[in-house]
Amino acid sequence: MVSYLTSCLSALSTLLLLLGSQLVCPQPSTEHRKVPQRMAVTEGTPEDSGSGSPGVWGSWGPWSACSRSCSGGVMEQTRPCLPSSYRARGGSRPNGRALSITGHVVSAVRTSVPLHRSQEDQRALAGSNASRQGPAVVRGSRHPQARGREPSERRSRTRGPIGPGKYGYGKAPYILPLQTDTTHTPQRLRRQRPSSRHSRSQEASASKQGYRPPTHQFSHSQPLYQSDSGPRSGLPPSEASIYQLPLTHDQSYPAASSLFHRPELSSHHGARPHGAAQAFPQHLRSTAISCIGAYRQYKLCNTNACPESGRSIREVQCASYNNKPFMGRFYEWEPFAEVKGNRKCELNCQATGYRFYVRQAEKVIDGTPCDQNGTAICVSGQCKSIGCDDFLGSDKVLDKCGVCGGDNTGCQVVSGVFKHALTSLGYHRVVEIPQGATKINITEMHKSNNYLALRSRSGRSIINGNWAIDRPGKYEGGGTMFTYKRPNEVSSTAGESFLAEGPTNEILDVYMIHQQPNPGVHYEYVIMRNNAISPQVPPHRRPGEPFNGQLEEEDRGQEDREEREKNQEKEDSQVEAPEVFTSESTQTFPVRHPERFPSHRPDNLVPPAPQPPRRSRDHNWKQLGTTECSTTCGKGSQYPIFRCVHRNTHEEVPESYCDSSMKPTPEEEPCNLFPCPAFWDIGEWSECSKTCGLGMQHRQVLCRQVYANRSLTVQPYRCQHLEKPETTSTCQLKICSEWQIRTDWTSCSVPCGVGQRTRDVKCVSNIGDMVHDEECNMKLRPNDIENCDMGPCAKSWFLTEWSERCSAECGAGVRTRSVVCMTNHVSSLPLEGCGNNRPVEATPCDNGPCTGKVEWFTGSWSQCSIECGSGTQQREVICVRKNADTFEVLDPYECSFLEKPPSQQACHLKPCGAKWFSTEWSMCSKSCQGGFRVREVRCLSDDMTPSSLCDPQLKPEERESCNTQDCVPEVDENCKDKYYNCNVVVQARLCVYNYYKTACCASCTRVANRHVGFLGSR
């Protein structure tokens, strides 16, 4: 054994000096098989080419633990590829257990992956793998040339110049402090290391984001198979169509398998189970097995939102590198998102306060969003879209009625037109939108002065509520987003509309604010039929059937991959490193393009000696300033300007002196990040309140501020340095029509006395056409009727005969007659019109003495209850006994044998004519600080038909002020904060939006009351 180790060390020293490459010493083996023979089998056996014997898929294993505890993690499910004869013997394993085959374990569950791995762990892992597998290399880094190299050489070989003034790109391994850096001693580096309090804060923030920070220790939770650099074939594991079972230990584990990767440390630590090896005959253990289809699938999990921590999942992952030295120094890292394509799932972090970034990890944590605005997430370094069934890579979408994977057969379209004639002003319900409705379209048939409004069944106003008209835009309500459109008042004839995709999570009511005749409202939405079944759960797939029914391209085999890797390494060794010249220094750095790196290389290869950069030309590209910022405020963009300069003198020369292919591509840089000053955003004028003459029009004026190319509504006091534009203005569309007298007065209605005469008065437009009276000003209308006096008429008394019956059956009574003053034309006049010599109307009569006779006594009739029209009048009726000189009042039953005279009768005086009628007052528009209420006033004649004969001066008011008292804050039990961090909503000034006003009702109400008090004190 000692001689064997001595020979290995001697061979290692010789090859390091001569070739600068890596030598792997094999461990002593009892099998006495030569290494070249083993390598020959690996490279030449047909089993590695992907054309092995066909296998069958086993049962799906259990789902792995979710990669995140909140905000959307990923679960993985795998299945083993078994020999076709294994199923025939009934060898299926229940519960989806992992299948062990000759020392290699195929895991059905992939657990969480630590964020980092320390150098001690990597060395321990390399030693463990070497002891278990014999002649093998430890893989995991795609940049093996960066290991074992001096710090200065390592900087010159990174992918792009990493230095001030330019972004860099490359992998950042954990390195020790620079040996040549005398200013950063170990003691000083320890002082620069973040404190334990900072580390604890990072761990707490990480736990809020749904995962635990790495402990940098191997445990049983590590995956048994893990891909650090991806398969050499260039296909991700989830996209390969041929799944190959690992070869037996006798034939060597395939180092570049397209789907299986090197085994990490597990709980066995060198022990090899033999149970699975005994389950297969010898001829199967020496043959590769391939299955068609995907061997694993992913599903979204734990979609509940994480508690607010102020940092995203990428920020937490980058911050976990704050206590790790990079290039001999400590930095604070933040995400660098300005990458495209397949780099979105890499962990690219930018050093805070510095203008360079580093790829800290080739893959982010599973479940990390690919970008800030999209819905796709990263899984195993690949950006995957999410289907409506929460399966990654699924192509299922919602149909019209919101059924995942549905074919619209269970959908029902509900549509109609609301054409009811409305009479009173205010809100009138149009249609009810049920829960679960999709494809919602509410549109006015024609343009009008009416407004559409939207309210939830709970009473919360979403659009145009509380007599306040909102601007067109997007409003959230009922679990969906409504688009409120209001057409241009001049060029469009279409009416208002509400549009939403749905589905709604509660019942919504659509209202119309009625101001003029209803032009009709068309409504349409889609709901699911009652008997429709929503296929939310995807059907179970048969073994061997690929996910979503898609077959993928077959693997081209192990030999093709190794051949491509050899060619790629040869090309990399011959490619010249281009040079980039920066303005901060005259030093040049070779740039390694990411696509030219080999897909996989061993980590323990000894890199060749570094070569100095080529300086074949005397001129370089240099950054000389930047372009002007695209905006003066609110986050603009600018680009660096590169010019051709002399290498030594730095003098600018024509661009033809430099190689145009080496000119750096200008990258966009943010500038002028401070927000723009607030300004008044002026809306469009509403329609004039009158069709002719002077009227009023209104517009909305909001204080807004622009930042990051977004216009936000802010509090009005931010615009107090500017004069606020007027919100109301007078308007006149045209000159109103005028009154015109078409005829002279008619003759008086009576030949004598006082009568009436009339004339024809019409409303005429400015072009001479007769129009409705409403087009003219009713207050300026000339009289079309007046009284006329034709002089006194001859008059005399007209009398009737005396009544035949005395008013009393016994005793003294009277007889009466009617007396009327009449003109010679038989027209009635007041009694005073014929003078004072009025004839008597009653004369006494006596039917003899009374002897206690019982009778009903009636009093005189009262005046009529009304002055005009039909009314009533009353009189007293009592039962009395009449004696010779006195009357005795008796109980009514004493006269019950006699017919009782009526005590009430109808009376009718002169006709009333037209009068003003009004409705009850509406509710006040505000409960405090001055609102208004309205009512409808109409002129009606005696038969209750509309008339225009009422006196305009006596018309009652149609609108009046109400609730002028100051507002007193009231405690609403339903007004509560639904989230614990509503103070952030208040600080961000988001209370102007209905969603946050409801979610943080208590906090927003307190701020609004303070703001009102502040304005009142000024």
Curated annotation (Swiss-Prot):
GO BP: elastic fiber assembly; microfibril assembly
Transmembrane segments: none
InterPro entries: ADAMTS_ADAMTS-like, ADAMTS_CR_3, ADAMTS_spacer1, PLAC, TSP1_rpt, TSP1_rpt_sf
SMART domains assigned: TSP1 (SM00209)
Residue ranges, compositional bias (Basic residues): 187-199
Compositional bias ranges of the Polar residues kind: 216-230
Record has Secreted as a keyword: yes
Protein name: Thrombospondin type-1 domain-containing protein 4
Species the sequence originates in: Mus musculus
